[in-house]
Design a protein with these regions (language model features):
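Helix-to-beta-strand junctions that scaffold the AdoMet/dcAdoMet cofactor pocket
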Residues: 60, 132-134
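Conserved beta-strand signature within the Rossmann-like core of class I S-adenosyl-L-methionine
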Residues: 135-145
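Short "lid" loop at the C-terminus of a central beta-strand within the Rossmann-like core
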Residues: 98, 143-147, 172
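Conserved SAM/SAH cofactor-binding pocket of Class I
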Residues: 25-117, 125
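Short alpha-helix immediately C-terminal to the canonical SAM-binding loop
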Residues: 74-76, 146, 150
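Conserved AdoMet
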Residues: 1-32
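Short loop/edge segments at beta-strand edges and connector loops
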Residues: 11, 94-96, 166-168
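SAM/dcSAM-binding transferase cores
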Residues: 151-209
């Protein structure tokens, strides 16, 4: 299926385990407060080929996962996977995060948002924070991370009603690649006029390279 649809560039088994499965779950397991949550609503923004959402659904069977992507063929592929793997606690949603945040059925609905993307962290925060409820979490999966990025992100996160709870820097187990996990917490409601995202501001998703 992956060769047919070209959903991920990672084809070697060990690379797949490290850069998809390990990466997906590390962001959750390294934060005990999140890992201990039960029966929560989770959204994977820009899921692509289903990461980190699919491994999350398998590892946390009492979580309800929404897999969001704007590409129909990716959603169709994931729908097939959900059926084949008999994963019943995940569903797909075809759409864009910038429009979903204006939908009252999704805004302030989720306990946890996950996002692995190459867009600027500020854009990722604008997509994710309006979707989580008070006291909810956002996990930004990043590669390299600089102190200046933290300083630039802080006021934007605050405007959206969040705060940077912590940042964890880790190494992958086999190739020693650097990963940074930015944990945001929703501490007050996002005002109705936010996020101020233009239609042309499109988040382009990819998996870690």
């Amino acid at each position: 299926g992956n060769q047919r649809l070209n959903l991920t560039r990672i084809t070697e088994p060990l690379d797949f385990v490290e850069k998809h499965l390990w990466d997906s779950l590390a962001g959750l397991l390294l934060c005990p407060t999140i890992a201990q949550l039960t029966q929560i609503q989770v959204i994977d923004i820009g899921t692509g080929a289903g990461f980190p959402g699919l491994p999350t659904a398998i590892a946390f069977p009492d979580w309800s996962i929404t897999l969001l992507d704007s590409t129909r063929k990716k959603i169709q592929f994931i729908d097939e996977l959900l059926t084949t793997l008999q994963i019943t606690n995940a569903k797909t949603w075809l759409g864009r995060a910038e429009t979903l945040s204006g939908d009252r059925c999704h805004r302030s609905y989720y306990d946890l948002a996950l996002i692995r993307a190459v867009a600027q962290p500020a854009i990722c925060a604008q997509y994710a924070l309006p979707l989580v409820k008070l006291d909810g979490w956002v996990v930004l999966y990043r590669g390299q991370w600089e102190k200046a990025e933290t300083e630039a992100l802080m006021p934007i996160v605050a405007e959206l009603g969040g705060k940077i709870e912590t940042i964890k820097t880790i190494q992958t187990p086999w190739t020693s690649g650097i990963r940074n996990l930015i944990y945001l917490r929703k501490v007050k409601s996002t005002v109705a006029t936010l996020p101020r995202l233009q239609r042309k501001t499109i988040l382009k998703f990819r998996q870690f390279s």
